[in-house]
Amino acid sequence: MKQVAIFAKVHDPRCQGVASELVTWLEERKCLPLVDTHLARHVGYARGLTEKQIRDRAELVVVLGGDGTLISVARLFSSRQVPIVGVNLGSLGFLTEITVEQLYPVLEQCLADSHRITERMMLDVTVTRGDQEISHCQVLNDAVINKGALARIIELEARVNDDFLTNFKADGLIISTPTGSTGYSLSAGGPIVQPLMKCVLITPICPHTLTNRPIVLSYQSVIRITVKSSFDEMVYLTLDGQVGVELQEGDCIEVSRAETTTALVTSPEKDYFAILRAKLKWGER
Protein backbone atom coordinates (compact mmCIF):
# COMPACT_ATOMS: atom_id res chain seq x y z
CA MET A 1 0.00 0.00 0.00
CA LYS A 2 1.46 3.34 -1.07
CA GLN A 3 1.17 6.14 1.47
CA VAL A 4 0.42 9.45 -0.25
CA ALA A 5 0.63 12.80 1.54
CA ILE A 6 -1.78 15.58 0.57
CA PHE A 7 -1.00 19.24 1.27
CA ALA A 8 -3.17 22.15 0.18
CA LYS A 9 -3.99 25.81 0.79
CA VAL A 10 -6.32 25.06 3.67
CA HIS A 11 -8.68 28.03 3.30
CA ASP A 12 -9.03 27.82 -0.49
CA PRO A 13 -12.42 26.21 -1.35
CA ARG A 14 -11.14 24.89 -4.68
CA CYS A 15 -8.15 23.24 -3.01
CA GLN A 16 -10.45 21.72 -0.40
CA GLY A 17 -12.68 20.27 -3.13
CA VAL A 18 -9.79 18.71 -5.06
CA ALA A 19 -8.27 17.36 -1.82
CA SER A 20 -11.56 15.70 -0.87
CA GLU A 21 -11.86 14.06 -4.30
CA LEU A 22 -8.22 12.97 -4.13
CA VAL A 23 -8.72 11.24 -0.77
CA THR A 24 -11.55 9.16 -2.27
CA TRP A 25 -9.57 8.42 -5.45
CA LEU A 26 -6.58 7.17 -3.44
CA GLU A 27 -8.67 4.98 -1.15
CA GLU A 28 -10.35 3.38 -4.18
CA ARG A 29 -6.86 2.36 -5.34
CA LYS A 30 -5.88 0.89 -1.97
CA CYS A 31 -3.58 3.80 -1.15
CA LEU A 32 -3.44 5.42 2.29
CA PRO A 33 -3.98 9.22 2.22
CA LEU A 34 -1.84 11.12 4.75
CA VAL A 35 -3.57 14.41 5.59
CA ASP A 36 -2.55 16.95 8.23
CA THR A 37 -5.05 17.76 10.96
CA HIS A 38 -5.96 21.23 9.61
CA LEU A 39 -6.75 20.03 6.09
CA ALA A 40 -8.46 16.89 7.41
CA ARG A 41 -10.88 19.03 9.38
CA HIS A 42 -11.83 21.02 6.26
CA VAL A 43 -12.36 17.98 4.03
CA GLY A 44 -14.09 15.76 6.58
CA TYR A 45 -11.28 13.20 6.84
CA ALA A 46 -11.19 11.50 10.25
CA ARG A 47 -7.55 10.40 10.35
CA GLY A 48 -5.59 13.66 10.52
CA LEU A 49 -1.86 13.46 11.28
CA THR A 50 0.89 15.82 12.38
CA GLU A 51 3.34 17.13 9.78
CA LYS A 52 6.12 15.08 11.39
CA GLN A 53 4.08 11.88 11.10
CA ILE A 54 3.37 12.64 7.46
CA ARG A 55 7.00 13.49 6.72
CA ASP A 56 8.23 10.22 8.21
CA ARG A 57 5.70 8.00 6.40
CA ALA A 58 4.98 9.52 2.98
CA GLU A 59 6.15 7.73 -0.17
CA LEU A 60 4.61 10.32 -2.50
CA VAL A 61 3.47 13.91 -1.91
CA VAL A 62 0.72 15.84 -3.70
CA VAL A 63 0.65 19.63 -3.26
CA LEU A 64 -2.51 21.51 -4.23
CA GLY A 65 -2.02 25.26 -4.53
CA GLY A 66 0.67 27.58 -5.83
CA ASP A 67 4.44 27.74 -5.77
CA GLY A 68 4.46 29.09 -2.21
CA THR A 69 2.63 26.03 -0.90
CA LEU A 70 5.03 23.71 -2.72
CA ILE A 71 8.11 25.55 -1.43
CA SER A 72 6.98 25.16 2.19
CA VAL A 73 6.37 21.43 1.62
CA ALA A 74 9.80 21.07 -0.02
CA ARG A 75 11.42 22.46 3.13
CA LEU A 76 9.38 20.06 5.28
CA PHE A 77 10.71 17.11 3.25
CA SER A 78 14.26 18.45 2.88
CA SER A 79 15.61 15.53 4.92
CA ARG A 80 13.89 12.97 2.65
CA GLN A 81 13.85 12.75 -1.13
CA VAL A 82 10.16 12.00 -1.66
CA PRO A 83 8.62 12.69 -5.12
CA ILE A 84 6.37 15.78 -5.05
CA VAL A 85 3.47 16.31 -7.46
CA GLY A 86 2.80 20.06 -7.67
CA VAL A 87 -0.73 20.86 -8.88
CA ASN A 88 -1.27 24.46 -9.96
CA LEU A 89 -4.28 25.94 -8.19
CA GLY A 90 -2.54 29.24 -7.50
CA SER A 91 -1.34 32.10 -9.68
CA LEU A 92 2.27 31.43 -10.69
CA GLY A 93 3.04 27.81 -11.44
CA PHE A 94 6.77 27.78 -12.19
CA LEU A 95 7.01 24.80 -9.81
CA THR A 96 3.40 23.59 -9.67
CA GLU A 97 3.32 22.83 -13.37
CA ILE A 98 0.69 20.07 -13.36
CA THR A 99 -2.90 21.10 -14.02
CA VAL A 100 -5.94 19.66 -12.25
CA GLU A 101 -6.86 17.88 -15.50
CA GLN A 102 -3.45 16.19 -15.55
CA LEU A 103 -3.47 15.24 -11.85
CA TYR A 104 -5.01 11.77 -12.02
CA PRO A 105 -3.18 10.58 -15.17
CA VAL A 106 0.09 11.70 -13.55
CA LEU A 107 -0.82 9.92 -10.31
CA GLU A 108 -1.55 6.74 -12.28
CA GLN A 109 1.99 6.99 -13.63
CA CYS A 110 3.35 7.53 -10.11
CA LEU A 111 1.55 4.46 -8.77
CA ALA A 112 2.97 2.45 -11.68
CA ASP A 113 6.46 3.92 -11.09
CA SER A 114 6.54 5.26 -14.67
CA HIS A 115 6.61 8.98 -13.82
CA ARG A 116 9.37 11.47 -14.65
CA ILE A 117 11.27 13.34 -11.94
CA THR A 118 13.56 16.37 -11.98
CA GLU A 119 15.85 16.87 -9.01
CA ARG A 120 16.08 20.50 -7.89
CA MET A 121 19.12 21.69 -6.00
CA MET A 122 18.59 23.11 -2.50
CA LEU A 123 20.75 25.38 -0.35
CA ASP A 124 21.85 24.85 3.22
CA VAL A 125 21.72 28.15 5.16
CA THR A 126 23.28 28.62 8.61
CA VAL A 127 23.40 31.80 10.70
CA THR A 128 26.02 32.16 13.43
CA ARG A 129 26.37 34.90 16.04
CA GLY A 130 29.80 34.70 17.58
CA ASP A 131 30.27 31.01 18.34
CA GLN A 132 26.56 30.26 18.50
CA GLU A 133 24.42 28.86 15.68
CA ILE A 134 21.09 30.69 15.79
CA SER A 135 19.41 29.36 12.65
CA HIS A 136 19.74 26.47 10.22
CA CYS A 137 17.46 25.71 7.29
CA GLN A 138 17.33 24.26 3.77
CA VAL A 139 15.77 26.36 1.01
CA LEU A 140 14.55 25.54 -2.48
CA ASN A 141 14.39 29.09 -3.84
CA ASP A 142 16.51 31.64 -2.04
CA ALA A 143 17.94 33.28 1.05
CA VAL A 144 17.44 37.05 1.10
CA ILE A 145 19.21 39.54 3.36
CA ASN A 146 17.45 42.89 3.40
CA LYS A 147 16.97 45.96 5.52
CA GLY A 148 13.97 47.28 7.37
CA ALA A 149 11.60 50.05 6.39
CA LEU A 150 13.99 53.02 6.59
CA ALA A 151 15.70 54.10 3.37
CA ARG A 152 19.32 53.47 4.35
CA ILE A 153 21.61 50.94 2.73
CA ILE A 154 23.35 48.10 4.55
CA GLU A 155 26.92 46.87 4.12
CA LEU A 156 27.54 43.17 3.62
CA GLU A 157 30.93 41.50 3.28
CA ALA A 158 30.88 38.56 0.86
CA ARG A 159 33.42 35.74 0.77
CA VAL A 160 33.48 32.70 -1.50
CA ASN A 161 35.48 29.68 -0.29
CA ASP A 162 37.26 32.04 2.15
CA ASP A 163 38.32 34.34 -0.72
CA PHE A 164 37.14 37.93 -0.38
CA LEU A 165 34.57 38.81 -3.07
CA THR A 166 33.47 42.36 -2.23
CA ASN A 167 31.60 44.55 0.23
CA PHE A 168 28.08 45.08 -1.04
CA LYS A 169 26.48 48.40 -0.12
CA ALA A 170 22.89 47.85 -1.13
CA ASP A 171 19.31 47.44 0.01
CA GLY A 172 20.07 43.75 0.35
CA LEU A 173 21.41 40.58 -1.22
CA ILE A 174 19.75 37.50 -2.74
CA ILE A 175 21.46 34.11 -2.80
CA SER A 176 19.43 31.73 -4.91
CA THR A 177 19.33 28.32 -6.53
CA PRO A 178 18.68 27.89 -10.27
CA THR A 179 15.06 27.18 -9.30
CA GLY A 180 14.96 30.51 -7.45
CA SER A 181 16.38 32.41 -10.42
CA THR A 182 12.83 33.13 -11.66
CA GLY A 183 11.78 34.49 -8.25
CA TYR A 184 12.99 37.57 -6.36
CA SER A 185 16.38 37.37 -8.08
CA LEU A 186 14.78 37.91 -11.49
CA SER A 187 12.95 40.99 -10.20
CA ALA A 188 16.28 42.37 -8.97
CA GLY A 189 17.92 41.96 -12.39
CA GLY A 190 19.37 38.48 -12.00
CA PRO A 191 19.64 35.99 -14.88
CA ILE A 192 17.26 33.15 -15.67
CA VAL A 193 19.06 29.85 -15.09
CA GLN A 194 17.80 26.44 -16.19
CA PRO A 195 16.65 24.70 -12.99
CA LEU A 196 18.68 21.53 -13.59
CA MET A 197 21.98 23.43 -13.68
CA LYS A 198 24.27 23.18 -10.68
CA CYS A 199 25.18 26.69 -9.59
CA VAL A 200 24.45 29.43 -7.05
CA LEU A 201 23.45 33.00 -7.85
CA ILE A 202 24.30 36.15 -5.90
CA THR A 203 22.12 39.11 -6.86
CA PRO A 204 22.44 42.49 -5.10
CA ILE A 205 19.25 44.47 -4.45
CA CYS A 206 19.59 48.10 -5.60
CA PRO A 207 23.39 48.26 -5.10
CA HIS A 208 24.96 51.65 -4.37
CA THR A 209 27.75 50.82 -6.84
CA LEU A 210 26.43 50.27 -10.36
CA THR A 211 29.23 47.82 -11.16
CA ASN A 212 27.99 45.41 -8.48
CA ARG A 213 26.31 42.96 -10.82
CA PRO A 214 24.73 39.53 -10.31
CA ILE A 215 27.27 36.72 -10.28
CA VAL A 216 26.88 32.98 -10.97
CA LEU A 217 29.07 30.68 -8.89
CA SER A 218 29.91 26.99 -8.85
CA TYR A 219 27.53 24.75 -6.92
CA GLN A 220 30.55 23.72 -4.82
CA SER A 221 31.01 27.26 -3.52
CA VAL A 222 30.67 28.06 0.16
CA ILE A 223 29.39 31.61 0.49
CA ARG A 224 29.79 33.59 3.71
CA ILE A 225 28.03 36.90 4.16
CA THR A 226 28.85 39.05 7.20
CA VAL A 227 26.66 41.96 8.28
CA LYS A 228 29.23 44.75 8.53
CA SER A 229 27.01 47.75 9.20
CA SER A 230 23.29 48.26 9.45
CA PHE A 231 23.25 51.92 10.53
CA ASP A 232 21.23 50.94 13.63
CA GLU A 233 18.52 49.59 11.35
CA MET A 234 16.89 46.17 11.48
CA VAL A 235 18.30 43.61 9.03
CA TYR A 236 16.50 40.38 8.22
CA LEU A 237 17.26 37.06 6.59
CA THR A 238 14.24 35.66 4.77
CA LEU A 239 14.28 32.00 3.74
CA ASP A 240 12.16 31.08 0.72
CA GLY A 241 10.07 34.17 1.43
CA GLN A 242 8.43 32.36 4.36
CA VAL A 243 10.81 32.09 7.32
CA GLY A 244 12.41 35.18 8.86
CA VAL A 245 15.52 35.58 11.03
CA GLU A 246 16.45 38.91 12.64
CA LEU A 247 20.12 39.71 12.11
CA GLN A 248 22.62 41.81 14.04
CA GLU A 249 25.87 43.48 13.05
CA GLY A 250 28.59 40.83 12.95
CA ASP A 251 26.26 37.92 12.19
CA CYS A 252 27.56 35.49 9.56
CA ILE A 253 25.30 33.76 7.04
CA GLU A 254 26.89 30.67 5.46
CA VAL A 255 25.28 29.26 2.32
CA SER A 256 26.27 26.05 0.54
CA ARG A 257 24.68 23.31 -1.54
CA ALA A 258 22.45 21.06 0.55
CA GLU A 259 23.10 17.33 0.50
CA THR A 260 19.46 16.64 -0.38
CA THR A 261 17.43 17.73 -3.40
CA THR A 262 13.74 18.30 -4.08
CA ALA A 263 12.31 15.65 -6.42
CA LEU A 264 9.54 17.19 -8.54
CA VAL A 265 7.28 15.04 -10.70
CA THR A 266 7.16 16.71 -14.11
CA SER A 267 4.24 17.25 -16.43
CA PRO A 268 4.28 14.96 -19.48
CA GLU A 269 2.78 17.75 -21.60
CA LYS A 270 5.03 20.70 -20.69
CA ASP A 271 8.66 21.62 -20.87
CA TYR A 272 10.58 24.30 -18.98
CA PHE A 273 10.70 26.73 -21.89
CA ALA A 274 6.97 26.40 -22.51
CA ILE A 275 6.41 27.38 -18.88
CA LEU A 276 8.78 30.35 -19.26
CA ARG A 277 6.99 31.55 -22.38
CA ALA A 278 3.60 31.28 -20.69
CA LYS A 279 4.56 32.89 -17.39
CA LEU A 280 6.79 35.65 -18.76
CA LYS A 281 4.55 36.21 -21.81
CA TRP A 282 7.43 35.97 -24.27
CA GLY A 283 6.43 36.67 -27.86
CA GLU A 284 3.35 38.66 -26.88
CA ARG A 285 2.79 42.30 -27.79
Swiss-Prot record:
Binding site for NAD(+): D67, G68, N141, D142, R152, K169, D171, T182, G183, Y184, S185, L186, S187, Q242
Locations listed in the record: Cytoplasm
CC annotations in GO: cytoplasm
Chief localization: cytoplasm
Alphabetized GO MF terms: ATP binding; metal ion binding; NAD binding; NAD+ kinase activity
Keyword Translocase listed: no
Needed cofactors: a divalent metal cation
Coiled-coil stretches: none
Catalytic reaction(s) noted: NAD(+) + ATP = ADP + NADP(+) + H(+)
SUPFAM superfamilies: NAD kinase/diacylglycerol kinase-like
Entry keyword set: ATP-binding, Cytoplasm, Kinase, NAD, NADP, Nucleotide-binding, Transferase
Enzyme class (EC, first level): transferase
PANTHER family in UniProt: NAD KINASE (PTHR20275:SF0)
Family note: Belongs to the NAD kinase family.
Protein name: NAD kinase
Naturally occurring in which organism (per UniProt): Trichlorobacter lovleyi (strain ATCC BAA-1151 / DSM 17278 / SZ) (Geobacter lovleyi)
